[in-house]
């Protein structure tokens, strides 16, 4: 592994976790979005992540949730069908919040790896100056 591979790998992790956080923010914003039963439900987005040979990760795309979503009874909703149902996204807030915590922790860990690597590089430069 080269001298700056740690930074390259941590940078790819930061980018992946930022993409994950962005998709979760959108999913959470739409967790209560309902549509008519004849329409497509909001599709949650989940990054598709692949490892990079030599270290790191890359986001290759987004997996979309089920367009059918789930049917919920809400007879007072103006979008409800004759039977009182609307279509909602397949995921709930609890699932999204759990993933949000994981994405935040991953982002924080990648930041810490970057800081530690920079400190190590600075220390090595100081040794070289002596």
Please identify what each model-predicted range represents.
Residues 1-130:
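Amphipathic alpha-helical polymerization modules
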